C-alpha cells in the first residue's frame, strides 16, 4: 500500500500508512485490544452504513469521513488514490487520457454512500451524491451512465439502477412494500430542497401506486397516494409523535401504534393527508 501511494504521488496517504505500520509494529503480541484500521480506504468500509448495522454514533463519524473521499462525480473506489483537494472540488475535474481503475470514481460506491446517508437521516447528503453521479448522465449512451465516472469502463451498468432507485423510491419516497400481505408502508424522507415531487405508476404485485408530495412555505406537508387496488392497505408513517396531528383529507384511515410510532392504516383508491414534521 505504501509503494502504491508513493508511486501515485499521494504524500498524505504515504504518511498515514507509515503511521499505521508503526502502530502495528509497536503493539505487543500479548495485547488483545481491538485496534481497527484501514489501508487502502476501499469503499467497502462503508457497507455497514449501507446495510444499517452500524451504531448511529459510529455511523455519523464514518459518514463524515467518507465525504472527504469524493470528486465532482462521486466516491473514489480506493480512497488512497485521492489527492488533498478531494472533497472540496465542485466544478472541476481532469481525468486520465488512458483508462485505468487506479484513481477510479464509480457509481457503485457513490450509490452505496447515498443509501448509507439516508439510512441515518441525511437525505440532503444523499441527494448530493446522486447529483454528483448525474453529472455524467448521457455522456455516451442516452439515458445511462458509465461504470466509471465520468466516461470510463462499461458504458451501461446495471448497478446504476440500484444506486438511484433505492435512494429515490425506497428512501426519499419511503415506499416499503409487503405484497404478500397486500400492504405498502410509506414514510417519506425528502431532501429539504424538494418541495414538490411525484413518483407515478410504481407496480407492486397486481397493484400500482403513485405518490405525490408537496411542502408549503409554512412547513405543512400534503401527501397523496393513488392506487389501483383499493383493498390494499397503505400504512402511512408521517413521523408525528402526536397522533392527532396528521389530518386525513381523503380515504379511510385508522390510527394505530407500532413499535412506539403512530401509523395511519389507510384503504381506498385515493388517500390524502396533511401533517407537519416534528
Describe each region flagged by the PLM.
Residues 1-178, 232:
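Active-site core of glycosidic bond-cleaving carbohydrate-active enzymes
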Residues 112-278:
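Non-catalytic C-terminal accessory modules of carbohydrate-active enzymes
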Amino acid at each position: 500500500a505504501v509503494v502504491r501511494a508513493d508511486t501515485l504521488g499521494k504524500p498524505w496517504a504515504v504518511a498515514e500508512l507509515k503511521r499505521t505500520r508503526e502502530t502495528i509494529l509497536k503493539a505487543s503480541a500479548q495485547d488483545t485490544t481491538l485496534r481497527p484500521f484501514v489501508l487502502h480506504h476501499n469503499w467497502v468500509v462503508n457497507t455497514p452504513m449501507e446495510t444499517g448495522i452500524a451504531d448511529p454514533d459510529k455511523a455519523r463519524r464514518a459518514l463524515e469521513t467518507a465525504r472527504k473521499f469524493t470528486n465532482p462525480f462521486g466516491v473514489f473506489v480506493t480512497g488512497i488514490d485521492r489527492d488533498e483537494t478531494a472533497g472540496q472540488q465542485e466544478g472541476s475535474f481532469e481525468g486520465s487520457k488512458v483508462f485505468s481503475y487506479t484513481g477510479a470514481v464509480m457509481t457503485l460506491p457513490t450509490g452505496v454512500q447515498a443509501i448509507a446517508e439516508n439510512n441515518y437521516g441525511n437525505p440532503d447528503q444523499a441527494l448530493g451524491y446522486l447529483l454528483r453521479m448525474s453529472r455524467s448522465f448521457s455522456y455516451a449512451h442516452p439515458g445511462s451512465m458509465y461504470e466509471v465516472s465520468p466516461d470510463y469502463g462499461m458504458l451501461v451498468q446495471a448497478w446504476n439502477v440500484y444506486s438511484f432507485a433505492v435512494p429515490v423510491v425506497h428512501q426519499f419516497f419511503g415506499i416499503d412494500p409487503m405484497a404478500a400481505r397486500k400492504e405498502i408502508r410509506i414514510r417519506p424522507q425528502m431532501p429539504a430542497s424538494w418541495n414538490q415531487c411525484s413518483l407515478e405508476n410504481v407496480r407492486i404485485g397486481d397493484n400500482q401506486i403513485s405518490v405525490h408530495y408537496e411542502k408549503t412555505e409554512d412547513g405543512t406537508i400534503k401527501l397523496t397516494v393513488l392506487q389501483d387496488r383499493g383493498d390494499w392497505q397503505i400504512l402511512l408513517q408521517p413521523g408525528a409523535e402526536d397522533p392527532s396531528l396528521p389530518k386525513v383529507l381523503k380515504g379511510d384511515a385508522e390510527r394505530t401504534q407500532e413499535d412506539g410510532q403512530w401509523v395511519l392504516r389507510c384503504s381506498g383508491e385515493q388517500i390524502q393527508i396533511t401533517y407537519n414534521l416534528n
